[in-house]
Amino acid sequence: MAEASSVNVGSGCAEKGPEELSQEPARPGTNISRVKLFDTMVDTFLQKLVAAGSFQRFTDCYKRFYQLQPEMTQRIYDKFVTQLQTSIQEEISEIKAEGNLEAVLIALDAIVEESKDRKEQAWRPSGIPEKDLRSAMAPYLLQQRDALQRRVQRQEAENRQLADAVLAGRRQLEELQLQAQARQQAWQALHREQKELLAVLKEPE
């Protein structure tokens, strides 16, 4: 009896199931990808879900049927649990595919790794809201100011071009008016000369 008990204790400590190995905590300093961590969380959730809905609780809800058909009840329970796990896994897979979740988590891992190599300290709030607001808003406001200045400069350049065009039009109009006046004066002078010539021709001999 003593030998048998010692063998059982030794065998129980020597081997572990795959589920027990997967649930062991990670060693300090090891990096676990967020994709693997997410999958582990899903698996843990499914295990706890199945544990919460144990066969004992299932039979408590259907005692009379279980008493009449215990084997059928077991098969129904097994099929229900399998379909539930499959349905949840499919839903999660669809969510991961629609949101491109794996790529996002991998990118997040890359960002975290890159941040480890940075020597400068990350931004931290100072505890003074006004100061933090100024430090956060100042770059944006400066950018907006520069954009407005560039827009004003473009508008001023367009206005100068428009003013130059208006002045050129006015000068051209003045030149046309002067030309018209000169032609009118020339025509009037010619008309007077014609009248004088006709008057001379009509004088009696």
Swiss-Prot record:
| Any single biological process term in GO | cell division
> Can you quote a single GO CC term?
MIS12/MIND type complex
Q: Which keywords appear in this protein's UniProt record, sorted alphabetically?
A: Activator, Cell cycle, Cell division, Centromere, Chromosome, Chromosome partition, Coiled coil, Kinetochore, Mitosis, Nucleus, Transcription, Transcription regulation
- Please indicate if the UniProt record lists Nucleus as a keyword: yes
**Pfam families per the record?**
Nnf1
Where is the region Disordered? 1-28
Q: Which InterPro entries match?
A: PMF1/Nnf1
Keyword Cell division carried by entry: yes
Its annotated compartments are: Nucleus; Chromosome, Centromere, Kinetochore
* Ranges in coiled-coil conformation: 140-190
Protein task? Part of the MIS12 complex which is required for normal chromosome alignment and segregation and kinetochore formation during mitosis. May act as a cotranscription partner of NFE2L2 involved in regulation of polyamine-induced transcription of SSAT.
Under PANTHER family, the record lists: POLYAMINE-MODULATED FACTOR 1
What interactions and quaternary structure are annotated?
Component of the MIS12 complex composed of MIS12, DSN1, NSL1 and PMF1. Interacts with COPS7A. Interacts via its coiled-coil domain with the leucine-zipper domain of NFE2L2. The interaction with NFE2L2 is required for the transcriptional regulation of SSAT.
- Mind telling me what this protein is named? Polyamine-modulated factor 1
Species this chain originates from: Bos taurus (Bovine)
